[in-house]
């Protein structure tokens, strides 16, 4: 099994706003995603996972860690990853940079609206 890894710079170099908006619009024509969120806590730290399954397209799990203490260490407070899985057999197909997805999906939704 070969898993594609898409880091921020590599992914951003391949994206453009018009194509992204077209893709989001096409996605809205697919069956509605089943979505579930989970939160885990340790003191002030948080792990958030959002899972989505679009029948006929696939599954995505976006996990984010929020470590407020990182600020004092000059480390990013929010980190994460997006894992994409096959709709056919559930195998991992890609690992995508969290910040790439957050930036482009959030802005793309706003542009499309």
Report residues per predicted region.
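N-terminal ligand-binding/catalytic initiation module
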Residues: 1-103, 111
